[in-house]
Amino acid sequence: MQIIFSRHAKRRARLYKIARFTIEDILKNMELSQGEHEIVKEVKGLKYPLKIVVRIENDILTVITNYPLKKGRKNEGILR
């Protein structure tokens, strides 16, 4: 599966100092179906859980956005 980062996702990762390989590791270890998903994971080294929004179409995984989830839920692995 090919992983593509949107321009917005690249900017959020740079702003919040989230390494690209951290996001890729989380996504490679998940079984995701077609459609849009919200993923919340605890990541070592980050104060807050990391939220990643992705879309999967035709075996291409596009990261729409990613950021530390500072408010609300801290449940790991939430999928919508």
Give the role of each language-model region.
Residues 1-80:
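Ribonuclease/tRNase effector modules and their secretory precursors
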